[in-house]
Amino acid sequence: LSGDQALVYDCHLSPDRARLIRDTLAARGARRFNVILSHWHIDHVAGTEPFADCEIIANPRTLAHLTREKAALETGTYAGPPAISPLILPNRIFDDRLVLDLDGETVELLTFDIHSDDGTVLWLPKRGILLAGDTLEDCVTWVSEPEALPRHLPEIARLAGLGATAILPNHGAEDVIAKGGYGPGLISATSAYVTGLIAGTLSPDLATAIAEPVKAGDLRFFAAYQDVHSRNLAKVAEAKAAGLLT
């Protein structure tokens, strides 16, 4: 937020929560809103309706996924209720890199093939701040495209090349984010985890699998993610059995 302009990175889980975001920013003086979608997954696009009169920015893959699944998302049949109706599609499309100006501060939108093939991160180069969407997650990534994991590794390395000193993922420990975010160790921990998934070397026990980055302070252990880890291992095993991942 700067002056009367607000950049909104993702629009939350539901229209009512997105409306609260807009109302809160408006109460602080915002009159112009630009929404950036980090990727097409439901928990990031469900609140588009309150921003229907605004510029909604995404890359062409995000637009393609949302267009393909629009009917199912709006009827609540894609991944179950609630229905996202109406789903407002992006109306400004870019690829690779888009530079925005927020009252003199450079804001870069960059595309990455991590977690999903349509990732968009928000990078503030002057301050070293990276809004990572779901490209990074504490304490482990959610594998949605297991066959793409080998593509993700060089993309994670490219993400590290930005040199971010403060990383704000969409899913992470609230206290870490409130204190300014994660360090670059979150990226190396993600790379190590993806490498272990591909190689099949990770312990089925989450605490054991991520013991080193937790000890180093790069991750926070969260017991509920044991289910995510188990699901990731199963998804990778299924992809290997189907010949989609070697």
Where are these regions (language model features)?
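Conserved beta-strand hairpin/beta-sheet module of binuclear metal-dependent hydrolase folds
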Residues: 1-23, 27, 121-134
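An active-site-proximal "capping" alpha-helix that borders the catalytic cofactor pocket
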Residues: 144-170
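Short, solvent-exposed loop/turn segments at secondary-structure boundaries
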Residues: 13, 70, 142-147, 178-182
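Active-site neighborhood of phospho(di)ester-bond hydrolases with catalytic His/Asp-centered motifs
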Residues: 9-11, 33-41, 57-60, 112-113, ...
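Active-site HxH/HxHxD metal-binding segment of metal-dependent hydrolases
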Residues: 18-19, 23-99, 192
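Active-site environment of divalent metal-dependent phosphoester hydrolases
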Residues: 14-16, 40-46, 63-66, 116-119, ...
